[in-house]
């Protein structure tokens, strides 16, 4: 099976992706503040290798405030206030998972190390400007990532929250994989069905049904 190094390496040969990376690099060199830091842009792939992927959570673009984004969707670095969407994710977990205690942090690396790919569809953003890198080619790259998971893996649970993620998931083979959809956990839409979706217990039910070990979602509480 290919590794993420193979997949990302072959994309780096493509003209569209060369242009994406060159634009981000030139913006950094021009003194613009770009999140996450260059060393963290591909963190999701460093922490969750392709052959380890069991669950994919799709975000949009990185947080655009200081010290928040570190390459995992919805996650922030330790010591940074938990953002509103993640507050709602925790709220649903507390409702859905017996014994889940809302953590005081928003650092989700422990999920990534268990096979949860925390993937934003756009991997960089300019400070203070949401969606500023939405049309640089990142979307094409993350389409390729999803295609690779779709083709290489079996029985992955995709959690698609909000219209953007659901549109992105239209190519997923639902005979090979599981797709759970809900409104986005942002304060604007969480009450429309994200709270009550039960996706975390359902993910573990689907994994166990296939003989795969469930995700210890409680690892963030420890």
Curated annotation (Swiss-Prot):
Catalytic site: 61 (proton acceptor)
Annotated NCBIfam families: PRK05254.1-1 (NF003588), PRK05254.1-2 (NF003589), PRK05254.1-4 (NF003591), PRK05254.1-5 (NF003592), ung (TIGR00628)
Protein origin, superkingdom: Bacteria
Native organism: Aeromonas hydrophila subsp. hydrophila (strain ATCC 7966 / DSM 30187 / BCRC 13018 / CCUG 14551 / JCM 1027 / KCTC 2358 / NCIMB 9240 / NCTC 8049)
Assigned EC number: 3.2.2.27
Catalytic reaction(s) noted: Hydrolyzes single-stranded DNA or mismatched double-stranded DNA and polynucleotides, releasing free uracil
Sequence similarity: Belongs to the uracil-DNA glycosylase (UDG) superfamily. UNG family.
Keywords from the named record: Cytoplasm, DNA damage, DNA repair, Hydrolase
SUPFAM superfamilies: Uracil-DNA glycosylase-like
Protein name, per record: Uracil-DNA glycosylase
Protein's UniProt keywords contain DNA damage: yes
One of the GO biological process terms: base-excision repair, AP site formation via deaminated base removal
One Gene Ontology term, aspect cellular component: cytoplasm
